[in-house]
Amino acid sequence: MSREITARPNKNVPIVVGVCVVAFFVLLAFMQQKHKTHSGGDYGVPTFSNGGKYRDGTRSADFNSNNHRAYGCGGSGGSVSSRVGQQLVVLAIVSVLIVSLLQRLRSPPEHICNGACG
């Protein structure tokens, strides 16, 4: 009568996947490129991300404003807390999908009795 020992399912895979997903969203949150706030270009004066005026004793510049919702100025949903909330919701959805997928893929270990099981 031969006996086979089945391998235990690897319980570290969901933990590793979860840590990778969290690290990815943290990377996205902190690595967003910022717009340029100062320039040494033609004017040699600070530039403004959404328009504005600059005036000192020798120079003045008027930068045209872009869209009123640009860079979260005056638009809803542009604050940091709302972006973090949205990222947490997406993180939760992705985590649930990954966990459910891993549970579906994990099959119960096969028990081979070779006719000796009672």
Curated annotation (Swiss-Prot):
Q: Which UniProt keywords apply?
A: Host cell junction, Host endoplasmic reticulum, Host membrane, Membrane, Transmembrane, Transmembrane helix, Transport, Viral movement protein
Any single biological process term in GO: transport of virus in host, cell to cell
Give the way it sits in the membrane. Multi-pass membrane protein
Give the domain of life. Answer: Viruses
Outline which residue ranges sit on the Cytoplasmic face.
1-11, 103-118
Q: Does the keyword Transport apply?
A: yes
Indicate where this protein resides in the cell: Host cell junction, Host plasmodesma; Host endoplasmic reticulum membrane
Secretion signal, residue range per the UniProt entry:
none
InterPro entries given for it?
A: Plant_vir_prot
Quaternary structure and partners: Interacts with movement protein TGB3.
Task: Provide the protein name.
Answer: Movement protein TGB2
